[in-house]
């Protein structure tokens, strides 16, 4: 009994500490975003050219008043928006039943999919996990995909969002990521999808978290992402554990093939849907198609709702974001987007990062949507979204050789960031 009480006290202390850290970090992050928006200068480098073409795309209304975008080079794929990290009363500190969370998500205007990923410590057991599966299935519809999973919540080794498993793994007694990784190697978990959750958020765990992205080649196909955005409007873009690179770059340079993931990490159904979105480019809205796209790293992470499709052109061959491409002398990255008018977000700047280092920055005109209403673009009344195309032309010697990777950071004016999944130069695996 004493041990149980001690564990509860540790958990409560951890939650209180994290809440305090969140509030202070949120203030400093907002200040930093505003400072960056006004002080960052353009950076131009030979052999990298950034062009921005606004007001290009039309939208059409589908389903529950969603705006779906038809991008001309999307190869028949669709962009679906959602969240993969949230909690209900099935977690120790969650508010709102699973039914309330799924119902709120399904009624939101732009969530195509939504996952409840309950903390496995203390309260989650096999009965509740089976019940969560059942509840999830009850909320599925033509326009909404409910997903269930769990958050492996190790006080020392870190938190991982785990999807597409029939069972969950308790972190009790686990001292390092090796315990989770051994479980993931079992045949029963062959379809598991795993995400590094909120790196660096719990500062007391920083010396040990993820054992700083220790690589394991046997599960590289299962650990598919890392949260680059956490809560609203916090962004965990760096510095990482070493203080020089961003968390995503530290993980990728450790050998992992990763997609950026946004996380609302809601612990209260009243906060659903929030602003953060994961964009998944898939053939259709089904669990099979969404999980297949996640496995291919065909995602983007954003701190505000947006429709986006990015791809790389190597010669005549097109590769969606997240792909592994062959080495070449020239490379073109095309990124098309539409931001809903009601978000009132203008783009502030575009950055090109190669192997974790910023190589080029383009400052954009600071705009509001009031400046972008000259051409009606939607069949929906009173809807004038900002839209545009970003084209990046990269030539040798700035195209990395294998292994290497390139990605964009796109900044909304005082609204956070979005990151399309990197383009990887194959064969990518570093280890």
Question: Which residues does each predicted region cover?
Answer:
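N-terminal Sec-pathway targeting helices
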Residues: 1-12
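Hydrophobic alpha-helical membrane-insertion segments, chiefly the h-region
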Residues: 11-22
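Extended, charged catalytic domains and RNA/DNA-binding interfaces, predominantly
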Residues: 20-431
């Amino acid at each position: 009994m004493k041990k149980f009480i001690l564990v509860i006290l540790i958990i409560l202390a951890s939650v209180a500490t994290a809440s305090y850290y969140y509030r202070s970090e949120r203030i400093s992050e907002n200040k930093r975003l505003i400072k960056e928006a006004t002080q960052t200068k353009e950076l131009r480098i030979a052999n990298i050219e950034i062009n921005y073409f606004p007001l290009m795309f039309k939208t059409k209304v589908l389903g529950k008043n969603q705006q779906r975008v038809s991008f001309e080079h999307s190869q028949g794929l669709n962009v679906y928006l959602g969240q993969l990290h949230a909690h209900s009363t099935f977690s120790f500190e969650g508010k709102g039943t699973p039914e309330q969370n799924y119902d709120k998500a399904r009624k939101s205007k732009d969530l195509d999919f939504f996952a409840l990923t309950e903390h496995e410590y203390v309260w989650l057991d096999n009965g509740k996990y089976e019940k969560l599966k059942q509840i999830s299935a009850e909320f599925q519809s033509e326009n909404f995909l409910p997903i269930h999973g769990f958050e492996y919540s190790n006080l020392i080794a870190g938190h991982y969002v785990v999807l597409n498993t029939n069972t969950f793994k308790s972190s009790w007694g686990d001292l390092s990521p090796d315990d989770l990784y051994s479980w993931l190697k079992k045949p029963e978990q062959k379809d598991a999808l795993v995400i590094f959750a909120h790196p660096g958020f719990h500062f007391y765990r920083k010396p040990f978290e993820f054992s700083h992205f220790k690589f394991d080649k046997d599960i590289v196909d299962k650990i598919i992402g890392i949260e680059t955005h956490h809560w609203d409007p916090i962004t965990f873009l760096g510095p990482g554990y070493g203080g020089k690179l961003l968390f995503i770059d530290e993980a990728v340079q450790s050998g992992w093939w990763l997609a950026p993931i946004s996380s609302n990490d809601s612990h209260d159904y009243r906060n659903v849907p929030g602003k953060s979105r994961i964009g998944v480019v898939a053939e259709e809205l089904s669990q099979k198609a969404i999980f297949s796209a996640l496995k291919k790293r065909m995602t983007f992470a954003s701190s505000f709702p947006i429709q986006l499709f990015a791809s790389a052109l190597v010669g005549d061959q097109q590769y969606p974001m997240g792909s592994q491409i062959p080495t070449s002398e020239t490379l073109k990255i095309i990124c098309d987007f539409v931001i809903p008018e009601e978000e009132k977000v203008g783009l502030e700047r575009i950055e090109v990062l190669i192997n974790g280092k910023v190589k080029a920055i383009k400052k954009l005109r600071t705009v509001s949507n009031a400046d972008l209403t000259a051409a009606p673009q939607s069949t929906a009344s009173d809807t004038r979204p900002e839209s545009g195309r970003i084209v990046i032309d990269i030539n040798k010697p700035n195209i990395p050789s294998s292994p290497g990777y390139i990605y964009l950071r796109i900044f909304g004016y005082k609204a956070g960031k979005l990151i399309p999944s990197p383009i990887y130069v194959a064969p990518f695996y570093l280890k």
